[in-house]
């Protein structure tokens, strides 16, 4: 179905892979195969073809949006008679555990930083804004990591609010997947980037998702463009289990790893453990808190096998 023939009853324009790839226009490939190999996640096949057909058109679209935003800022400055500072453009990336949000974020960071209009692109994950393990243990929330109540939302909202307010240096806490905790005194300083990519489970959530912690503004209020990375639930579970098995042979073997004991599991035990963790924690969080936010996104990327994007929906 062509773009013109699509229903007016949906807020999204829908593109199959070939339709979306055609929108690349003449945007050059700026990444080498070696650079792409460094960007992909532990359990993903990221190819030059995927970058060319999916991410280059997306970077072109984002460059249009960012340029439009800069013109809007210039109009406001002209109206006010001021010469204000440049305010970061914020892109959020949401989706399930194991869907490949981090890879999407890293690829976009690499591509967007090569556009001459916006060289400084920072990437922050919301994992750093989880409450420390000590707090989660005190509140009985260790098995609820990633659920709304496990985040220090006041700190996260203040972080993005300060960035949008033009604060010169803003700090973000850093999370370690090795120790499964926020790194004490490990804050990262973000100094007025042109673009901030904010990646996490909760970046599309709003105040209604936090009835236990009411506040009037939320992360999504400060986001300029939002992306939801989607995939069928059966694929998500498979990817989660496969990732767990690779961690079992890799990161979990480190004696300092919080999950070091999992390295001693047999393959069958590891598969069963991962399946249980998926069902009891990650699937539950997906159904209750993440998937309901999908239609709030500016753009939805739907993946099929091998993490290949097969469909893109763009909000009109």
Curated annotation (Swiss-Prot):
Annotated GO biological process: coenzyme A biosynthetic process
Presence of the UniProt keyword Nuclease in the record: no
EC number: 2.7.1.33
Enzyme class: transferase
Pathway membership: Cofactor biosynthesis; coenzyme A biosynthesis; CoA from (R)-pantothenate: step 1/5
Key words of the record: ATP-binding, Coenzyme A biosynthesis, Cytoplasm, Kinase, Nucleotide-binding, Transferase
GO molecular function: ATP binding; pantothenate kinase activity
GO CC aspect terms: cytoplasm
Record has Transmembrane helix as a keyword: no
Chief site of localization: cytoplasm
Catalytic activity: (R)-pantothenate + ATP = (R)-4'-phosphopantothenate + ADP + H(+)
Pfam short name (any one): PRK
Subcellular localization, as worded in the UniProt entry: Cytoplasm
Positions that bind ATP: 95-102
Alphabetical list of SUPFAM superfamilies matching this protein: P-loop containing nucleoside triphosphate hydrolases
Family designation: Belongs to the prokaryotic pantothenate kinase family.
UniProt protein name: Pantothenate kinase
